[in-house]
Amino acid sequence: MKIPLRFLLISLVPTLSMSNLLGAATTEELSASNSFDGTTSTTSFSSKTSSATDGTNYVFKDSVVIENVPKTGETQSTSCFKNDAAAGDLNFLGGGFSFTFSNIDATTASGAAIGSEAANKTVTLSGFSALSFLKSPASTVTNGLGAINVKGNLSLLDNDKVLIQDNFSTGDGGAINCAGSLKIANNKSLSFIGNSSSTRGGAIHTKNLTLSSGGETLFQGNTAPTAAGKGGAIAIADSGTLSISGDSGDIIFEGNTIGATGTVSHSAIDLGTSAKITALRAAQGHTIYFYDPITVTGSTSVADALNINSPDTGDNKEYTGTIVFSGEKLTEAEAKDEKNRTSKLLQNVAFKNGTVVLKGDVVLSANGFSQDANSKLIMDLGTSLVANTESIELTNLEINIDSLRNGKKIKLSAATAQKDIRIDRPVVLAISDESFYQNGFLNEDHSYDGILELDAGKDIVISADSRSIDAVQSPYGYQGKWTINWSTDDKKATVSWAKQSFNPTAEQEAPLVPNLLWGSFIDVRSFQNFIELGTEGAPYEKRFWVAGISNVLHRSGRENQRKFRHVSGGAVVGASTRMPGGDTLSLGFAQLFARDKDYFMNTNFAKTYAGSLRLQHDASLYSVVSILLGEGGLREILLPYVSKTLPCSFYGQLSYGHTDHRMKTESLPPPPPTLSTDHTSWGGYVWAGELGTRVAVENTSGRGFFQEYTPFVKVQAVYARQDSFVELGAISRDFSDSHLYNLAIPLGIKLEKRFAEQYYHVVAMYSPDVCRSNPKCTTTLLSNQGSWKTKGSNLARQAGIVQASGFRSLGAAAELFGNFGFEWRGSSRSYNVDAGSKIKF
């Protein structure tokens, strides 16, 4: 049987671990038979004691659960697993199984679950799929001493899930008390929740702690609930060390407290006298959150500086993650107590790399502060940076632009005599995301007076470069200019905003709205062409026709213009009659259904009703020229050269259409990330007029395919308008009315071919647009009053048009006809297809 590589590697881990740890140590295998439940067991619980000087290894062959110890009516005064003072190392090798302690009420045992009296020896728990210490002991045990208590060192390594919850100690370390060094590393999930100590370290008390995340790491709701309590989550003993590395997951301190009822305050970590933080760092993409402050015991400064986001000596790993000190999770009452917002270190602090963020009115206090060019310090208004004994030197100070309107100030203080504050680069206005520039308050100019306050014991040095401000801009939203002005003594800085314009995002712009007028333009021209087509064919005195009509317009996309498509179709009915004077009068009505889309967020559905009136006057070219030349010598010179039989036509046409629009907008507004579909309705209309003339030239030579050549020239005018409207929905916008005007002078030739019962013609024309007003409207985003011009497409002003039509008689009283047209412009293409029948009256 083939063994998958993944399972082979997993099986090798405990094997390799044991080969390193077992040596001459005593080995005992643990299985499900070693589990115990005091509520169901008929025997008393028996603790395991290790005394082998070469050490003891517990090798797990199955999951083990020890719970409800002791049985009702009995007492438990010894740790479930005990390591004697003379014993060697104690190793628990999980082998991928789980190990659980729950409700272990060991009254006087130092470590209800695990206790080790062996100084300078190490207890290791590694390789478990789940490792849990729950209520071991619970706070109901008034003399409990935590879940794990070791006089040497302790390691929690390479476990999938570690949950340490609701444990209690009357001494130090509600869950863990380690006299030596505690190493917690590479655990995929680690949670210390609701543990409590009557003295120091609600969850952990130790001399030296190395905490390295292998996944999300959470310290929540731990407490030292006495007047003398220190370190809600972690307490470091005097002269101890603390190293925190967010290597493979976020680390969160939240809701950890100290103090008796009525004097409760927040505390994440307490550093004993002369204790120090040796490392505070997060890898790229990870963050360490201090929603509770760091406190110190005593006032003795530590010589070693804290280099934030700096690797160990000789390690090339880069730490570019984020360290956050925040008071955001405090209640309004808690935020009023400065202790809940103040983190204090008795070390010099150097920001070496990555980002340090101060939020929610916190105060970060240390001996002094310096900053390398590769790091960023981002401060909310209301936060403070306080140097107690040294100077402050900053190279990359950023102000969180989202906090500008909270009415507070950023404070930098180095008030000790002969100490300076130095800012070597421009202050930066930082934004968390580009949506900031969608805020409606940016619609007006603003000045934020004195939002940066500096207090130095000696000098405030603002370099020449720092007297300007760098703002992270967005290509979308409100556009404007940020400026910074320093007071004469450089103790205060004022930041100002001057609005310039508003640039919509692609989701907000909606160019389809003005482009709908191009759809009306195409439809009304096609309708007018159809009315002209209805007068063609057999020379009936009176005729009635009915047909289907369809149009397609495709506008290609450009760098600054979105592509769109218009498709319409419907029915046309019409009639024409020859009047007593020989003129032809035509009348038509149409109903069209259209669909427009911009290939992005908007789709429009439209319904158009249109009517058209056309009058054509036929005469000979000779009579027309005779009238135009009037009386005089020029008439006598030119008129003899004009054919008296060549037919000429003049015609005029007027059309009107009304359109009802219904637009669908699909958007993805955050939050929640769910697709939203909104519908909006409004109306519009279109007028179109046309004047033209043509001369039909008969091919009498008998040569060539076509029998008649008809050159023509037209003047076409189209005016389309749509009403203003307000769109309501996820993206609410107000669109002003918009219009399109276009004047074209098409000229071309019609080539005709006739048979006994059939008739064809082909038209080729060139149509320049000599005057045009492109569609546009003013759009206002109702959520922030941002306003901009939404411009429709600017179709190329020269068009080449080809049309082909065919007619076939069905006896003396009926006729079928069809037409295909294609229009090409440099930026668009349009097609129309018509087919119908005529009936003679």
From Swiss-Prot:
A cellular-component GO term for this protein: extracellular region
Lipid bilayer topology: Peripheral membrane protein
Keyword DNA damage: no
Subcellular location, record wording: Secreted, Cell wall; Cell outer membrane
Pfam families: Autotransporter, Chlam_PMP, ChlamPMP_M
Cleavable signal peptide: 1-24
Keywords per UniProt: Cell outer membrane, Cell wall, Membrane, Secreted, Signal, Transmembrane, Transmembrane beta strand
Classification via NCBIfam families: POMP_repeat
Family: Belongs to the PMP outer membrane protein family.
Protein known as: Probable outer membrane protein pmp2
Species name: Chlamydia pneumoniae (Chlamydophila pneumoniae)
Lineage: Bacteria, Pseudomonadati, Chlamydiota, Chlamydiia, Chlamydiales
Gene coding for it: pmp2
